[in-house]
Amino acid sequence: MPRWEEKNLIEEGKKLGYQVATIYSKDFVLFSNDFTIDNDTDLFIQRNVSHNRALITSFLVEQVGYPVINDHTTLIRCENKIFTTYILARHNIPTPKTFIAFDKTNAIEYSKKLGYPVVIKPVEGSWGRMVAKADNLDVLYSYLEYQEFSTQKYKDIYYIQEFVNKPNRDIRIFVIGDETPVGIYRVNENNWRTNTALGAKAYPLKIDEELRELALKVKDIIGGFFLGIDIFEDKDRGYLVDEVNGVPEYKNTVRVNNFNVSKFLLEKAAEWVKK
């Protein structure tokens, strides 16, 4: 079922005079020896909730020769937290201290070196699901054991991060093309996780020059056209880039900022296609 964002994109596209069509993954078929799509389309905008479907459909559309927002390479870099963190860190983007381990012994040893509490995250996932904070060894061991016997695709790879003692909020900035038109604070008074899916409230954000430059640097490194960038505030180190979303939701951003993200995205995408 389309979310608010997809419905709004269709509505705003029609207002702008564009011909807008919705293609559902379940109806999408492409033969390997017939690289054609029976569709008079200038641009595809990827809005799959499922990462696997988003990745594969973007890839297939690209093979036919259509531009797509976002391309499959960007989606890989965004969805896989290992790719995101290590690509950004290699390019000197400030990120939370993170390590990857491939067995529990190393995960435990290096968590001690990192210092408790630590945060355990699934390699892929969104909305704060299965993200846990371990305050000590006993709690960490329980989470590692749970992951080991779970059905996660990367259950034998441990992504462990420092716990950033941020305010009870984080920052979400949207990059569209080469601009940072809007952002929000996500504030959670009842949970250290600041995802709106877990009860965080959205508030308007005034994007300063430092934030704008940081977000655009991330976009240049990760790629893509439309990104949602999650940033922590650390009292000593300043801004830390935590995650990047390649198919971002923005309903709450529109609501609190009174900013038409769909219209802005469509207009900028139309300019991009014409170049």
Swiss-Prot record:
Positions that bind Mg(2+) 1: 230, 243
GO molecular function: ATP binding; coenzyme F420-2 alpha-glutamyl ligase activity; metal ion binding
Residues that hold Mg(2+) 2 according to the record: 243, 245
Note on how the cofactor is bound: Binds 2 magnesium ions per subunit.
Pathway in which this enzyme or protein is active: Amino-acid biosynthesis; L-lysine biosynthesis via AAA pathway; L-lysine from L-alpha-aminoadipate (Thermus route): step 1/5
Biological processes, Gene Ontology terms: lysine biosynthetic process via aminoadipic acid; protein modification process
Induction data: Activated by LysM and repressed by lysine.
Superkingdom of origin: Archaea
The keyword Lipoprotein is annotated on this UniProt entry: no
InterPro entries xrefs: ATP-grasp, ATP-grasp_RimK-type, ATP_grasp_subdomain_1, LysX/ArgX_preATP_grasp, LysX_arch, PreATP-grasp_dom_sf, Rp_bS6_RimK/Lys_biosynth_LsyX
Keywords: Amino-acid biosynthesis, ATP-binding, Ligase, Lysine biosynthesis, Magnesium, Metal-binding, Nucleotide-binding
Catalytic activity as recorded in UniProt: [amino-group carrier protein]-C-terminal-L-glutamate + L-2-aminoadipate + ATP = [amino-group carrier protein]-C-terminal-N-(1,4-dicarboxybutan-1-yl)-L-glutamine + ADP + phosphate + H(+)
Cofactor: Mg(2+)
Sequence positions that bind ATP: 81, 121, 125-131, 161-172, 186, 195
Sequence ranges assigned to domain ATP-grasp in this UniProt record: 85-270
Gene3D superfamilies from the UniProt entry: 3.40.50.20, ATP-grasp fold, A domain (3.30.1490.20), ATP-grasp fold, B domain (3.30.470.20)
EC number(s) on file: 6.3.2.43
Residue positions of motif N-[TS] motif that is essential for LysX substrate specificity: 252-253
Family in the record: Belongs to the RimK family. LysX subfamily.
Biological function: Catalyzes the ATP-dependent formation of a covalent bond between the amino group of alpha-aminoadipate (AAA) and the gamma-carboxyl group of the C-terminal glutamate residue in LysW.
Oligomeric form and interacting partners: Homodimer.
Name of this chain's protein: Alpha-aminoadipate--LysW ligase LysX
Species: Saccharolobus solfataricus (strain ATCC 35092 / DSM 1617 / JCM 11322 / P2)
Gene: lysX
